[in-house]
């Protein structure tokens, strides 16, 4: 199943053309690395995929829903329920515990007490960090910190 399709995307900033008839297909479960020089358009590409920016022309299809028909409400729904975006800065409080950082994420704030602890434990298990709840973030490796950030989303 195709999760993300960009079809004939065009994007420019003034005279600078970032994308000309650019197309991309990403299947569900597929991992893709995006690399390029500074100013090449990597962030713009991710912003287009994340519905944070619109291309000048072309279409974006996410989980079967096709732009440009995305209303603001539909885009918000897709961003909340179908997309995850991990920034280069993980946004963790390094002097706090993993559990305290997890509680800052709104998806865990809805559950309280034992239910909240179980949701946090499940999310950490999914990223291979079972039992890390009481560890201080600054004691974790960069990769472990990244996995905590992934577990939060």
Identify the function of each model-found stretch.
Residues 136-140, 144-145:
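Conserved ABC ATPase signature
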Residues 50:
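Helix-to-loop junction immediately C-terminal to a conserved catalytic motif
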Residues 4, 19-21, 78:
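Conserved structural motif at the start of ABC-family nucleotide-binding domains
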Residues 66, 114-132:
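Conserved ABC ATPase "signature" region
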Residues 95-105:
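Short coil-to-helix segment of the ABC ATPase nucleotide-binding domain corresponding to the Q-loop/switch region
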Residues 35-37:
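The feature captures the beta-strand-to-loop junction immediately N-terminal to the Walker
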Residues 67-84:
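ABC ATPase NBD coupling module
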Residues 58-69:
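Conserved ABC transporter NBD signature motif
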């Amino acid at each position: 199943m195709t999760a993300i399709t960009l079809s004939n995307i065009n994007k420019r900033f003034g005279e600078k053309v970032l994308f000309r008839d650019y197309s991309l297909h990403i299947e569900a479960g597929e991992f893709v690395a995006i690399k390029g020089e500074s100013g090449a358009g990597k962030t713009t590409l991710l912003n287009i995929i994340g519905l944070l920016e619109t291309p000048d022309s072309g279409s974006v299809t996410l989980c079967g829903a096709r732009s440009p028909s995305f209303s603001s409400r539909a885009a918000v729904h897709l961003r909340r329920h179908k997309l995850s975006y991990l920034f280069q800065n993980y946004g963790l409080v390094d002097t706090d515990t993993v559990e305290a950082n997890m509680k800052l994420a709104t998806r865990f704030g809805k559950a309280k007490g034992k239910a909240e602890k179980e949701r946090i434990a499940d999310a950490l298990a999914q990223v291979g960090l079972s039992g890390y709840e009481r560890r201080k973030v600054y004691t974790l490796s960069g990769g472990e910190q990244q996995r905590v950030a992934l577990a939060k989303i």
